[in-house]
Amino acid sequence: MSGEGTVNPQRARRLHDADVVYLYDGSFEGFLCCVFESFAQHEIPFAVWTPQRETTTLYPVKDIPTDHARAQRVFASFGKKLGAETEYLVSRDFLSGREDKELLLIRFLHLAFALGPGTVKRTGHPDVAPLYEMKKSLDWEVDKFQGFVRFEEHDGMLGAVIHPKNYILPLLRPHFCGRFPEEDFLIYDAVHQAVLLQQERKTRLLELAAPLELPPPSEREQQFQALWMQFYKTLEIQARHNEKGRMSHCPKRFWADMVEMKDEF
């Protein structure tokens, strides 16, 4: 990058693979600081880790501190130099559950700053294609969970548990806040230990230090669940049962969090 500001594409062309691991805090701003370091050193790190993914390695580990001002300048350079489409794609793909997402994004950004805004359109390029694969996975999960989230009543609040591969709570937020504008509810992502909480019409995304255990559903809720399961089983015409079709529309990994499927999980 040039000074503390933007990325210089001429310097990006002198890129080399480095036997070093970046370690950052897992936040988007922290990732942007990894991007800055990569450009400043003209290097592609061997790996980029968060504390949760840290493991034994023979390579030196470089701690990348999160600097808010630096991260803001890096992010501003995306829109200014690469365009809104690239800014959107990088921001969205950071929510991917792929363990190598940071490395894929850094490789793409080096290419994009070298070639310009049109890089994002080169979907067949080996450093561009993975970004669309991550986006496809995110879009697919968001679409599925908009229909498959099952709420239970817990002490006057609606609660649901999900196990997504990607961190999709920020992407689910507009849908469920629009669907339940007057309700108090929470959606707990048990994989990423995060909660989407709406209370008194205020919505927050919270990262938890420990797993969350929801209280048992109320007796009234259990009665409704029993009725729903009975309705679900009665609705099906057994002679037309299509297990392949059912698995296609509702993959088995969703079943554990769906009331009507728990008996079959």
Which stretches of residues belong to each language-model region?
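Short coil/turn segments at secondary-structure boundaries
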Residues: L89-D93, A190-V191, R240-M247
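Short, hydrophobic/amphipathic alpha-helical patches that form generic packing surfaces
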Residues: G30-Q41, R107-A114, P174-G178, A226-K233
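Long, compositionally biased intrinsically disordered terminal regions
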Residues: E182-D184, V195-K202, L212-F265
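Internal, well-folded beta-alpha domain core
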Residues: P117-L208
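Conserved aromatic-histidine-acidic binding/catalytic patches
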Residues: V20-S27, K62, P126, M157-I168, ...
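N-terminal ordered "arm"
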Residues: S2-D67
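Charged, alpha-helical interface segments at or near domain boundaries
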Residues: W49-K144
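Acidic, Ser/Thr-rich peripheral helices and adjacent loops at domain boundaries
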Residues: P65-V74, K202-L214
